[in-house]
């Protein structure tokens, strides 16, 4: 069933979605479940799984449409850009090990780039904060990997570094390539060895998962086949890339963000790099790979809050200041910004 067909029949099925598919681990309705049910019933999302510290999980709606499959708490979602935080985390681990200098020119680690032959000043940190001057143009999206790389490394900034925040997927692709150059591992292998395994994240994947019964049907990015990455850049290249498009479940993502709250697994330098604001201008406030701006902060969370979203309908967040952390995973149907606002409402309600 396509998105339009689903929305057409939504009014007739809203009552079923509210009473038959929406559940909590406690089995009782509450404010979080009521908000989740509302988002499903109004067509903002097809389904949702959300969880917070303490392990309680809420879920409801549908994970697939034809035939309809109810959402399950261990469903695997395409994280889209929320997986950029894995790339940032790997860089932070390399920094903590003394193998990566965030304030070095990024071309020190990526000599293939055209700027390596020029005086440019763009640092690794600039890439992580999206302030190096690159825009979000994607001239490198072609089917041939060799040509993909040639165009990727030929991309030039459109403005001087540090002038403005401009979210660009290529920034994180470059950081992913830097991780691979330093470690000698492909990005997924590096994530498994350095980040996911130490955190106990056993159900997170940076490759397609066709045939997996837990894979959610994503309704964005051209409605890709179930279990396949939706991002056009990820589809164009045969290996994991730093701009995101990994698959994971709510339990694994809570392990990831909750560790940023408790700071128990990795060296102090890892947490400090990721949680310290390093670009502030106007309403923009960025740390290394994370958004710390007030506009994306759930109600009641402190100024230390770190969040990241994903186009498919995902938000992950942690507030080391108040001890909050949470994950909202949806297969979004409605408008993107309305989806993010819905995520913030759920995170605020879960943390009361």
Model-identified regions with their sequence ranges:
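N-terminal export signals
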Residues: 5-23
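Short, conserved catalytic-motif segment at the N-terminal edge
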Residues: 28-77
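Short active-site loop at a secondary-structure junction
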Residues: 42-47, 67-126, 159-170, 241-244, ...
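Short, surface-exposed loop or secondary-structure junction motifs
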Residues: 46, 57, 62, 116-306
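Short, gly/Ser/Thr-rich active-site loops of penicillin-recognizing serine hydrolases
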Residues: 295-299, 335-352
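Short, well-ordered beta-strand elements
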Residues: 315-316, 323-332
């Amino acid at each position: 069933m396509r998105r339009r067909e689903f929305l057409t029949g939504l009014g007739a099925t809203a009552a079923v979605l509210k009473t038959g598919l929406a559940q909590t681990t406690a089995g009782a309705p509450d404010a979080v479940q009521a908000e989740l049910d509302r988002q499903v019933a109004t067509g903002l999302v097809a389904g949702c799984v959300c969880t917070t510290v303490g392990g309680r999980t809420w879920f409801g709606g549908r994970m697939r449409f034809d035939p309809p499959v109810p959402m399950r708490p261990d469903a695997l979602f395409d994280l889209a850009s929320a997986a950029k935080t894995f790339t940032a985390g790997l860089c932070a681990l390399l920094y903590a090990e003394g193998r990566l200098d965030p304030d070095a020119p990024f071309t020190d680690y990526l000599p293939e780039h055209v700027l390596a032959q020029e005086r440019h000043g763009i640092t690794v940190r600039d890439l992580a904060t999206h302030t190096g001057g690159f825009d979000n143009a994607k001239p490198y999206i072609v089917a041939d990997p060799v040509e993909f790389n040639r165009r990727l490394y030929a991309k030039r900034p459109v403005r001087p570094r540090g002038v403005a925040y401009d979210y660009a997927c290529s920034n994180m692709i470059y950081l992913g390539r830097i991780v691979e150059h330093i470690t000698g591992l492909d990005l997924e292998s590096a994530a498994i060895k350095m980040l996911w395994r130490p955190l106990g994240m056993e159900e997170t994947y940076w490759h397609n998962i066709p045939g997996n019964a837990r894979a959610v049907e994503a309704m964005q990015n051209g409605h890709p086949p179930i279990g396949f990455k939706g991002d056009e850049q990820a589809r164009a290249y045969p290996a994991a890339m730093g701009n995101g498009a990994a698959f994971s479940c709510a339990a694994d993502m809570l392990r990831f963000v909750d560790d940023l709250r408790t700071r128990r697994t990795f060296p102090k330098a890892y947490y400090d790099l990721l949680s310290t604001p390093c670009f502030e201008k106007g309403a923009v406030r960025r740390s290394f790979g994370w958004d710390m701006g007030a506009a994306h902060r759930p109600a009641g969370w402190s100024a230390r809050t770190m969040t990241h979203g994903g186009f498919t309908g995902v938000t992950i967040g942690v507030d080391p200041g108040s001890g909050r952390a949470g994950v909202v995973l949806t297969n979004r149907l409605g408008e993107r910004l309305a989806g993010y606002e819905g995520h913030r409402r759920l995170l605020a309600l879960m943390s009361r």
